[in-house]
Amino acid sequence: MHADTLDAMLHHELPHAAAGCQQAYGRIVTACQNTVTAIALAITRDVAASEDIAQEAFLRAWQRLAQLHQPASFLPWLRQITRNLARDWLRSHRHRPLSGEAADLAIAMAADPSPSPAEQALQVEEERAALEIMSALPNDSREILLLYYREGQRSQQVASLLGLSDAAVRKRLSRARATVRNELLQRFDTFARGSAPGVAFATTVTAATMLAAPGTASAAIALGGIGSLGGVGKLGASGLSGSALTSGSAAGALSVLLGMPMAIALLAITGVTLTTYMSGAYLLRFATTAREAAAIRGFTRLSTLTAALTCGAPLLLRAFGAPKWLALCVLAVGMSVVCYHTLGTLPRIMQPMLERDARRRGTTRPPLLYRCMFSRSAIAVSLAAVIVPIAYRYGVLGLV
């Protein structure tokens, strides 16, 4: 995006974003994501960490948009948030040696789903060359060099994004070029463009803004600390699970069926609907194409509706005086549909994405967090949490 176009877009979209419009903020994220990830990558020299840091920077800015009075101050402010987060990450990882693992992961993220061994070897070599360049340059030169290649080799655009003069950018570019060989610069060009964030990055950040409106603190709670999820994104783990969906879908109905107050039921319905929607935000972390993201969003909408109906229908039946056995039957049907979606539909959608993610990580299994959230055993545990109270209440006590 041209510098003048970016400035005009920020002036137009920032007031809407500050008013709580997630779509407007999503467009801002898309326009600025190259800049923010480049700054983080220049400091950390770790592609996965740079994307995590960039996500948190965007979300912190979203939370504090009310503090911003001039649209022209947004980019400098966002850059400073990013640098502070990246330096915090660097301090917490100062004793961690740089190794080939980060390079392999970065290349895999930029690679096709199934590269040949020859392509993989070439990509790893490009990544190593890029790391060699980054290690030889100061932070400011890394930022400029990364953005220069990501923004189509336009120094004026880089100057606008980093708040520098074009002359200063050209001077630092010249100094950086003098430090490295032309062959390495060509490899760095490939790395810089290949490691740039894609569609899924902006989609994930926009989805995370649903957790809280600007000016509240709940997004910070959901995000947690940098790296706390081992590279699975900054959406947090609490409640984002198929097991929470399964047990939560029944919680509202059970609270009334087992004689608990209606307020608890309404709270459970609200919680499970939000939980289901948030689970889609976590799953979007695995999507790398618009089609994959659309499939996950479709599953999320369907699951949210199913969960709400599973909670609400038994409550309505009881409110209108229907017998408990009928409400329990409706609950059982709803739970069956929820389980079908979680154990049938979701694995079909996620299988190619999980396989690609496993290849990137050099393993054959989904991430531990995903297994804890969406595996058959997790669903079985949540089902037991529903069945046991029913069996106790209506079996042991002999109630009808």
UniProtKB/Swiss-Prot annotation:
This protein's UniProt keywords: DNA-binding, Sigma factor, Transcription, Transcription regulation
Disulfide bonds: none
InterPro entries: RNA_pol_sigma-70-like, RNA_pol_sigma-70_dom, RNA_pol_sigma70_ECF_CS, RNA_pol_sigma70_r2, RNA_pol_sigma70_r4_t2, RNA_pol_sigma_r2, RNA_pol_sigma_r3/r4-like, WH-like_DNA-bd_sf
Position of sequence motif Polymerase core binding: 62-75
DNA-binding region: 165-184
Keyword DNA-binding attached: yes
Stated name of the protein: Probable RNA polymerase sigma factor RfaY
Species per Swiss-Prot/TrEMBL record: Xanthomonas campestris pv. campestris (strain ATCC 33913 / DSM 3586 / NCPPB 528 / LMG 568 / P 25)
